[in-house]
């Protein structure tokens, strides 16, 4: 496996990338000499890879336990984390255990948050199986779950001991999830590494047929892009905020779509909206907007808000974006990452954010939705999935943000798998 050292201020960990390298993955896990390996996966990934991986770990590394959760963003909640932690403790987890996050961004966040909380922190290894996870989410120290107010609002910062990525896992992904990953790749090129735009434009495939060499190049460029903005900002609160490009509207579209729009596809559409907002504010020209739409379309995502997504819900979620508070924005404004040209991020003081009137952003959302028409925008049927967990929502979210008694945390069932075997009163309270 090819190793890249990911360095963010005082945080550092190896990212190991290969193809058809399952034996190397297990060898790296064995080198950690854990008392047990807590493999966290959703039910789809568990069926595809869970039994084989845990059997290999049992043989070569030590005892392993497969802890599963239901598929989808709607299950990325504190309730799921708590249920998995109870299972882990019931199966004998201790301070020398290692949490292995096997799956996409949803699983990575759930497992990462659990690792940060068990015994106030045990070792975490990411084994990503989606494009978004390989080139984006596992490169962040942010481990967060959703609340009824929005995405990723409850969490911690926690560092993995390493990332072990085998691109062979991408072969089982449906086109929807490949396109989702390419949305994040386009973001990296437009906002951080414009030098990769020419090659990327020729490499993008709407049919999602990427060879291993191209995929490894895409992942390597994304690692470099992330390093460009996080090497001095491990918590992504200053220069690292550039990684939020397209996410203000993208998260709102994703959340409001109730599973029809995957995360990266939402970000892709969100970037086209951000480019149009920048143009209307006088910061960018029509050429930048056209470039955004061309690249998003080349990635296989229609560059418009899908016509079946309720724009009223999208506009509702815009007001709850997780970048609130970074700027002292006037009333009726929300902070956004905007570009004036590829790689040219607008700043307010030292912050790569600009306060944008919500009324303007809402107008751009409405116009994009009207343009989406019968084409369906960024949506694809979630039922088309044949591979690992997608990185976007897969089930209903609350119709409007706010404390709803029957919100995701209340509705999410306990993860599948045996209940804790230890008596409720056994052992000291952690």
Curated annotation (Swiss-Prot):
The keyword Protease does not apply. Residues 379-399 have a biased composition (Low complexity). Keywords: Antibiotic biosynthesis, Cobalt, Lyase, Metal-binding, NAD. The keyword Lipid metabolism does not apply. Residues 371-430 are annotated as: Disordered. One of its GO terms (biological process) is antibiotic biosynthetic process. It is an enzyme of class 4 (lyase). Its EC number is 4.2.3.124. One of its GO terms (molecular function) is metal ion binding. Co(2+) binds at residues 184, 247, 263. Its cofactor is NAD(+); Co(2+). Binds 1 Co(2+) ion per subunit. Coiled coil: none annotated. Pathway: Metabolic intermediate biosynthesis; 2-deoxystreptamine biosynthesis; 2-deoxystreptamine from D-glucose 6-phosphate: step 1/4; Antibiotic biosynthesis; neomycin biosynthesis. NAD(+) binds at residues 42, 73-76, 105-109, 129-130, 140-142, 151-152. The active site is at residues 142, 244. Belongs to the sugar phosphate cyclases superfamily. DOI synthase family. Catalyzes the intramolecular carbocycle formation from D-glucose-6-phosphate to 2-deoxy-scyllo-inosose (DOI). This is 2-deoxy-scyllo-inosose synthase. It comes from Streptomyces fradiae. The gene is neoC.
């Amino acid at each position: 496996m090819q190793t890249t050292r990911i360095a963010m201020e005082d945080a550092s960990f190896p990212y190991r990338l290969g193809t058809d390298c399952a034996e190397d993955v297990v060898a790296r896990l064995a080198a950690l000499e854990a008392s047990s390996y807590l493999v966290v996966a959703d039910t789809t990934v568990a069926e595809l890879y869970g039994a084989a991986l845990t059997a290999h770990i049992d043989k070569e590394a030590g005892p392993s336990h497969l802890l599963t959760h239901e598929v989808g963003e709607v299950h990325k909640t504190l309730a799921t984390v708590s249920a998995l932690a109870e299972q882990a403790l019931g199966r004998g987890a201790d301070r020398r255990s290692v949490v292995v996050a096997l799956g996409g961004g949803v699983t990575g966040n759930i497992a990462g948050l659990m690792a940060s909380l068990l015994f106030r922190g045990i070792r975490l290894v990411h084994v990503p199986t989606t494009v978004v996870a390989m080139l984006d989410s596992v490169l962040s120290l942010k481990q967060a779950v959703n609340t009824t107010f929005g995405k990723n609002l409850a969490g911690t910062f926690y560092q993995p001991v390493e990332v072990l990525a085998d691109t062979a896992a991408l072969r089982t992904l449906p086109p929807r999830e490949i396109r989702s990953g390419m949305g994040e790749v386009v973001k990296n090129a437009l906002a951080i590494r414009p030098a990769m735009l020419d090659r990327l434009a020729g490499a993008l495939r709407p049919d999602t047929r990427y060879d291993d060499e191209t995929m490894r190049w895409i992942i390597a460029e994304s690692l470099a892009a992330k390093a460009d903005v996080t090497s001095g900002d491990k918590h992504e609160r200053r220069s690292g905020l550039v990684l939020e490009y397209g996410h203000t509207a993208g998260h709102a579209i994703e959340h409001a779509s109730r599973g029809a729009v995957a995360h990266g596809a939402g970000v892709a559409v969100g970037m086209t909206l951000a480019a149009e907002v920048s143009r209307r504010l006088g910061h960018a020209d029509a050429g930048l907007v056209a470039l955004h739409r061309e690249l998003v379309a080349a990635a296989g995502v229609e560059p418009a808000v899908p016509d079946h997504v309720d724009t009223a819900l999208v506009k509702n979620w815009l007001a709850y974006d997780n970048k609130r508070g970074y700027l002292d924005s006037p009333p009726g404004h929300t902070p956004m990452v905007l570009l004036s040209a590829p790689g040219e991020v607008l700043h307010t003081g030292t912050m790569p954010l600009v306060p944008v009137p919500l009324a303007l952003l809402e107008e751009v959302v409405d116009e994009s939705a009207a343009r989406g028409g019968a084409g369906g925008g960024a949506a694809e049927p979630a039922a088309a999935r044949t591979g690992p967990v997608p990185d976007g929502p897969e089930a209903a979210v609350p119709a409007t943000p706010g404390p709803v008694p029957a919100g995701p945390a209340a509705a999410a069932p306990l993860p599948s798998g045996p209940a804790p075997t230890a008596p409720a009163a056994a052992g000291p309270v952690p």
